[in-house]
Amino acid sequence: MYAMNPLYDMCAVEVGQHYYWLIAGYQVHAQVLITSWFVIGFLLIGCFVASRNLQEIPEGGQNFLEYVLEFIRDLAKTQIGHESRKWVPYLGTLFLFIFVSNWSGALVPWRLIELPNGELGAPTADINTTVALALMTSTAYFYAGLTKKGFGYFSKYLKPTPILLPINILEDFTKPLSLSFRLFGNVLADELVVAVLISLVPLVVPIPMMLLGLFAGAIQSLIFATLAGAYIGEALEGH
């Protein structure tokens, strides 16, 4: 039956299987590295092409790039406030990487590329990527608070009353968990649902679900960047 369905090989779902590289004695998750490098390369090439011939009156790729930059600046200013300027590169990198990663899961035919074990997919459909992004964000807001207030930053754990110390500490540790699992769960679920639908019904039928996945991927990148900005702004303001 599988041999009669030409789409089966493309949409087969392999969960829990991984392809590893051995580098300097350490096993690294090759699938995530390959797809992440693809996303990074796409962003670098896109930015280079759009900005290689800057004009006083922007047009084409430069116009789009400036629109994205303005959007990220507004996002950072809304969440962080008057100190947002130096955090624009970080929030912009987060947003663009997650956005392109999410969309690559639906638009790039990763499953046509065969690996010895496992399969390729969106980088954000792997928990290793989302946890890394969440830990980077945790490091960023701790850095923001410590550079502005020194060790006095930790006094926030005693507010409004020292009784809440354990809960306040737990809150900071749950932030990266919620960030990583929310993004991972949404992207992985979308990929699995689309793959199963394609294996069961003709290719045209799952298109609405794929479009919904693109919309959800864009929303998830916005949510992640917005929450990252909110956490950094909270660390700077102290409330």
From Swiss-Prot:
Gene3D superfamilies from the UniProt entry: ATP synthase, F0 complex, subunit A
MF annotations from Gene Ontology: proton-transporting ATP synthase activity, rotational mechanism
Swiss-Prot/TrEMBL keywords: ATP synthesis, CF(0), Chloroplast, Hydrogen ion transport, Ion transport, Membrane, Plastid, Thylakoid, Transmembrane, Transmembrane helix, Transport
Subcellular location: Plastid, Chloroplast thylakoid membrane
Coiled coil (residue ranges): none
TM region positions: 30-50, 88-108, 127-147, 192-212, 213-233
Gene Ontology terms: cellular component: chloroplast thylakoid membrane; plasma membrane; proton-transporting ATP synthase complex
InterPro entries: ATP_syn_F0_a_bact/chloroplast, ATP_synth_F0_asu, ATP_synth_F0_asu_AS, F0_ATP_A_sf
Membrane topology: Multi-pass membrane protein
Description of how the protein assembles with itself and partners: F-type ATPases have 2 components, CF(1) - the catalytic core - and CF(0) - the membrane proton channel. CF(1) has five subunits: alpha(3), beta(3), gamma(1), delta(1), epsilon(1). CF(0) has four main subunits: a, b, b' and c.
Functional summary from the UniProt entry: Key component of the proton channel; it plays a direct role in the translocation of protons across the membrane.
Record-stated family: Belongs to the ATPase A chain family.
Name of this chain's protein: ATP synthase subunit a, chloroplastic
Organism: Nephroselmis olivacea (Green alga)
